[in-house]
């Protein structure tokens, strides 16, 4: 049975939307101007930035007395509370599994935080397994993390697909591992010339349909 490798944040769950929701509420609570949302989004860098950097940036910009540790926890809790599993995404995962695919999440991040996302949203019920960078000591785009995912699933990378939104981590990593890929464009244009996705889709449901139809 072929592997279906999946990114987590902004692929299976809308991490960007959850962060925006928290950020708007937080900025409103401290009386910051609405246009500061753009600054905060740039610091977060679509989740690629460190939560500690976001916390320190907020403390410095607004002279907040709250400790960095407490602010980091507030940010993480605020995002977690807003994450939801779209029922249509759950349905698409179930269809892919029924079609013979083995869904495995491959994600960069802290083990506790990423596992909490999987369990609190209910995604864990639709996956064969998951691989988290902190746990295995290697991050996307290193192809080793994809090999670990195959080992976890007792499968092979031959015939596998990777679905994700990050050009470097997901698509670059898949290319290095010799795996076909679907890039979730999210309204963006592909810019990288060294490698490219096998397919492009607007969202994860369309991406999963592409993978299922490829057999």
Where are the model-predicted features located?
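N-terminal helical cap/lid subdomain that shapes the substrate entry/recognition surface
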Residues: 1-91
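Asp-based, Mg2+/Mn2+-dependent phosphohydrolase catalytic module
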Residues: 1-2, 90, 94-97, 101-215
